[in-house]
Amino acid sequence: MVDHTSTGQPRPDRLVMMIVSDTDAEELQSRLVAGHYPVTKVGSTGGFLRRGSVTIFSGVPQSQVDAVIAIVDEVCHARRELVPVQTLPFIGDGAFSAEPVEVRMGGGVVFVLPIERYERF
């Protein structure tokens, strides 16, 4: 078993998984690092528009989960964008409209998972 006390860092027992718009990812990562939270960033895509998103992982003690979520809440905001109808996946190939559709974009989704085992090498 690895001795975690030698690092001086509290042992993480929660994995905070944050899925955010790539528009907000850089600022979120900077704020988390400034708060001394460990960060791993992975590019991803998702949502019904298949736009770029980023998944950020941070292993923290349970006592710090609310602080991490507060940073996500401060940085990641939903926005409204006008999108051409042709780009919507649920519209047929022959669809055409001169008027774009307003769609909610961005924001974030947070999952908090228990860590059963943690090892640092």
Specify the residue positions occupied by each region the protein language model found.
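Positively charged, small/polar-rich N-terminal and surface patches that mediate targeting and assembly
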Residues: 1-121
